């Protein structure tokens, strides 16, 4: 199978709702698609020792992360009959309530779109060198674990 074009995954700050909506809208003309599956990772306002998380500040080893994102994409295209796939992950500060991860898969049939999306999200969380520092309301921070 031919390798797919390498895609830019990282965005500075939150993934906007408008970006997600525009991504969905662009696929309405692709009539060979029968199903989409979307995962949106949102920053929670968790409580840590009596203080609330205000944001997560994401950092990454970008070169390694981009290589791993590409490998995950290639593996998913090889395993599932996907028409399209998009992955976008935040770098920098993302406030509680905002989106930090957007995974969007499309296929002629729902099972492939759903299974691929789920597998991609799990692999990102387990394999990609991205770290989140939870910034608390008093300015202190806690390193997040997946």
What is the predicted function of each stretch?
Residues 1-99, 108, 112-118, 122-146:
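N-terminal, polar/charged subdomain of small-to-medium soluble alpha/beta proteins
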Residues 104-106:
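Short hydrophobic/aromatic beta-strand micro-patches
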């Amino acid at each position: 199978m031919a390798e797919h074009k390498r895609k830019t995954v990282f965005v500075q700050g939150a993934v906007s709702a408008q970006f997600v909506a525009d991504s969905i809208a662009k696929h309405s003309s692709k009539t060979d698609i029968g199903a989409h599956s979307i995962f949106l990772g949102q920053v929670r306002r968790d409580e840590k020792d009596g203080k609330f998380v205000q944001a997560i500040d994401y950092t990454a080893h970008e070169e390694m992360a981009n290589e791993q994102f590409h490998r995950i994409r290639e593996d998913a295209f090889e395993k599932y009959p996907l028409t399209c796939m998009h992955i976008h992950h935040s770098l920098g500060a993302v406030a509680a309530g905002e989106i930090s991860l957007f995974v969007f898969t499309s296929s002629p049939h729902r099972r492939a779109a759903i299974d691929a999306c789920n597998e991609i999200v799990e692999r990102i969380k387990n394999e990609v060198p991205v770290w989140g520092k939870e910034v608390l309301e008093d300015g202190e921070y806690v390193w997040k674990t997946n």
